[in-house]
Amino acid sequence: WVRQGLDLLDALGLEKVHLVGNSFGGALAMALAIRAPERVQRLVLMGSVGVPFPITEGLDAVWGYEASFENMRRIMDYFAWSRDLVNDELAKLRYEASIRPGFQESFSAMFPAPRQRWVDAMTSAEADIRALPHETLIIHGREDKVIPLSNSLTLADWIPNAQLHVFGHCGHWTQIEHSARFNRL
């Protein structure tokens, strides 16, 4: 995936970019910055994977999603702290997207059980993370049930030029649950 990201930058003729990575995408953004630091200006990591942690019940449920409206409704409860955001209408939209031809097959092939191995595979070495020279904004929801807040605390400790912002009353959807404040960051 990192190679694909670098190939995309090349295809678009982009020499140096700001990278924003959410969750699994945070691990990929960080891995790309480690592999090709000269291609990255700044990093934004949101509820990021990339450091060691035991898989959460929420992440295991999300990665193990089997298409049904009920399952979609259930996993959405892991994403948001605010019950106002989790409703049947949104669950229906996300469920319908999940049953498009080919989606379920490709999604389930990405993270088959046992899933802890995929968390471990996305982990970057501590020394590599500590060597990142980039200004890095780390954002996390305090009540995140998918990726533990401790991940962002570790990243903030290890990345020399990191700033950490934790949103209270917020789950894994920082950009949705606190959109106006998130955008001001």
Language model features by range: what are they?
Residues 66-130:
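Conserved alpha/beta-hydrolase catalytic His-Asp/Glu region
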Residues 132, 138-140, 144:
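Short beta-strand/loop motif that positions the catalytic acidic residue
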Residues 90, 125-126, 134, 148-157:
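Short alpha-helix in the alpha/beta-hydrolase fold that links the catalytic acid
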Residues 1-21, 183-184:
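Active-site loop/oxyanion-hole signature of alpha/beta-hydrolase fold enzymes
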Residues 160-185:
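Catalytic active-site module of serine/aspartate enzymes centered on a nucleophile-bearing elbow/loop
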Residues 30-35, 40-74:
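Flexible "cap/lid" loop of the alpha/beta hydrolase fold
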Residues 21, 25, 29:
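Gly/Ala-rich beta-loop-alpha elbow adjacent to hydrolase catalytic centers
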Residues 117-119, 142-147:
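Acidic catalytic loop of the alpha/beta-hydrolase fold
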